[in-house]
């Protein structure tokens, strides 16, 4: 809403002295409001002072000041003279929000009648309801609740602040931190406040209460929150739990009450690897340390005895020794070196600090050790039986967890899937431990983008996609699953640049529905283009495009044909990848060139036996589109063509514009180009494999398509893995493509 200023100066020239007088009157108006001088306010308004004037520093108007003073009469006077009831201060606060801070129900009613929104907020996300909780204004809080205020609204802050994990607090957290016991009771008992709502840093109201510098009501507030089911294992800044914060407050009563909670994790550590017991020893808190020891705190969490000795606390030393603390505590070796370079620093830190073991697993749910977010928690660094692993967290018993573990257990022998090391359960969560890789495919392509050099092969794309194809092939044939979520974030690259398939929480045990396999193949087709394009087209954009549009975006014939075959796999969809691993896309340029030479070396081609099977197969069909090699003799370097035709000069049997003669030409040139007498010819052509790839970009695919299901495929390079999994369905052992593949 625009500011409504009913006291604008009359149009026309004004003297500088007049302007100065007007500005002075504006400042005097604010001063008069602050001094609660109603008569002077009236006089200045009638004299032309700007009722919506905002002072420079905070953007306060006369109305804001009147609301702050709870002067309802001055507020009404200003409104009658055109004060804007929704004008914001520089921090975004409106008169309505300030009325909640002042605790004036009458002013809150007034501004609601003037168009205020009960849930409007300032630029930092504070609503009137939150401010009433912050300042302990019970009547205002109850009034706003009745008028529809959102009790559990989380503070929405600026985007840059949100990236720093600031904001997200609720009115309950504010009341807990400020020590307003009555407000807290009302919020919990009458208004249904969520006791375990968390701010953007993951802190609940219990953490906020323990962060308060005022300890007078902290015990009462803590008891109240615990009685309403507050989570005692939540973490605040630097990973501190309520128990650790209570120890830092040196508050024996709080520690006692927290230890009475059924699910308290007594050995949890903060981000520095310190437990509540270690902190109690460092802070020389004998009674708290003794209480923790009696409640079962691990004494294997640091050099407790030496710390107590350095503090000259002999009685604490005796307590610690009586509970099993070691005199000769040996921390992890300082010279330990991680295998992972990307995660090395965090792994060294995790290796160094104390963490209570969960079965065979050591890990820490903390931002410092987080690899990625997931729908059920996240993926973290960890050690499983001292092996570096990625730990994927699930809610125990969730369908996603069951699918992930079931699929991983069936794939233990497959090298192109992440290795499954084991899992552990704890506090209603399942922790699944798999191969720790360096980065996702998406992150890897960010590094490789722009590396393409003209006239050079893309070995990276070929190798990565070969690994991905083998992984999906293993998943389909050996494991009997379909993935259902193939995307760049689920392809991981290890320290040796090998690709591994991961994230099986959407995978399905294949029961014969070809559509499930086709879904994987279509995603693979998009992954092919994504990798070839080095991620320059986002996978989300590729998913939004039709299959035909994706095919047309292909940069070369091999890529185009491979994607087309993935989109149209034919009847035997489950066998498709077995054959596509032998597709020309995966051949080196030298292999493509060698294949053309080998086919051209067939005797029926060399002798132009026109009725032969191979020349019949290579003959273009009547409905086929034109090819780059239709008039191939005109596209070869003129000098080279003359030189090669010279051999047939006596018989007049020159090369003709047929596929067979082109293959014979490639064979003959390959046999002789390295001879000394053909040195000049090689200078003109350069590398023959590159020359023919560029001159006839569709030739290899043409030959492959014509000969793939014939005996002449013997000339194709053998790229299949010797341990290729066998299909347990029909046709899997033949090694031949299905009609559609």
From Swiss-Prot:
Biased composition (Polar residues): 9-18
Implicated disorder: Prostate cancer, hereditary, 1: A condition associated with familial predisposition to cancer of the prostate. Most prostate cancers are adenocarcinomas that develop in the acini of the prostatic ducts. Other rare histopathologic types of prostate cancer that occur in approximately 5% of patients include small cell carcinoma, mucinous carcinoma, prostatic ductal carcinoma, transitional cell carcinoma, squamous cell carcinoma, basal cell carcinoma, adenoid cystic carcinoma (basaloid), signet-ring cell carcinoma and neuroendocrine carcinoma.
Effect of residue 240 to N: Reduced 2-5A binding activity; almost complete loss of 2-5A binding activity
Pfam families: Ank_2, Ank_5, Pkinase, Ribonuc_2-5A
Cofactor note: Manganese or magnesium. Required for optimal RNA cleavage rates.
Phenotype upon changing residue 392 to R: Complete loss of enzymatic activity and enzyme dimerization. No change in binding to 2-5A and RNA
N6-acetyllysine carried by residues: 684
Region ranges (2-5A binding (P-loop) 1): 229-242
Coarse class of the protein's main subcellular location: cytoplasm
Molecular function (Gene Ontology), one example: ribonucleoprotein complex binding
Organism annotation: Homo sapiens
Effect of residue 584 to A: No change in enzymatic activity
Classification via InterPro entries: Ankyrin_rpt (IPR002110), Ankyrin_rpt-contain_sf (IPR036770), KEN_dom (IPR010513), KEN_sf (IPR038357), Kinase-like_dom_sf (IPR011009), Prot_kinase_dom (IPR000719), RNase-L_RNase (IPR042745)
Tissue expression per record: Highly expressed in spleen and thymus followed by prostate, testis, uterus, small intestine, colon and peripheral blood leukocytes.
Ranges where the KEN domain occurs: 589-723
Subunit structure, as described in the record: Monomer (inactive form) or homodimer. Interacts with ABCE1; this interaction inhibits the RNASEL.
Protein name: 2-5A-dependent ribonuclease
Gene3D superfamilies, per the entry: Ankyrin repeat-containing domain, KEN domain, Transferase(Phosphotransferase) domain 1
Cellular component per GO, a single term: nuclear matrix
Cell compartments where the protein resides: Cytoplasm; Mitochondrion
Region (2-5A binding (P-loop) 2) location: 253-275
Entry note about domains: The nine ankyrin repeats also called 2-5A sensor constitute the N-terminus 2-5A binding domain.
Region ranges (Disordered): 1-21, 715-741
